[in-house]
Design a protein with these regions (language model features):
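Pyridoxal 5′-phosphate
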Residues: 1-129
């Protein structure tokens, strides 16, 4: 049953926590660095990986974030989440309410190539009309 899979996953995470954390931190830094100077987007949150988790939120300025997220998935194979992420007050404080953001969640199985593809896709989508 599923409980055995959950147990195995928790054991794996306990054994690999530091490695996973460093991997996600490195990929997050790579993505932040790739997005920091992209015109046409607002990169929500802190500018570096210090003090943040491996979630990066982007607001496509003057574009529909939902359409940008759809294009990310259908043109580039990148799964994201779009909207207010059950946190409308956080988006009000970030200045992204009511549109929300496109959220990228980086995990232990993501690769540098996937991050580079995501950055390239954001750059293209931010510049297309």
């Amino acid at each position: 049953p599923g409980i055995f899979g959950l147990h195995a996953a928790l054991r794996w995470l306990e054994e690999n926590f530091e490695k996973v954390h460093e991997h996600e931190k490195a990929l997050s830094a790579r993505m932040l660095d790739g997005l920091k100077d992209v015109e046409g987007i607002y990169l929500a949150g802190l500018p570096t990986v210090e003090g943040r988790v491996s979630v990066i939120s982007v607001d496509f300025l003057n574009k529909d974030n939902g359409i940008c997220a759809f294009n990310q998935e259908h043109e580039y194979g990148i799964s994201t989440r779009v909207g207010l992420h059950c946190a409308p007050l956080a988006h009000k404080s970030l200045g992204t309410f009511p549109e929300g953001t496109v959220r990228f969640s980086i995990g232990p199985f993501n690769t540098e190539e996937e991050i580079d593809t995501a950055v390239a896709a954001v750059k293209i989508l931010a510049q297309t009309k």
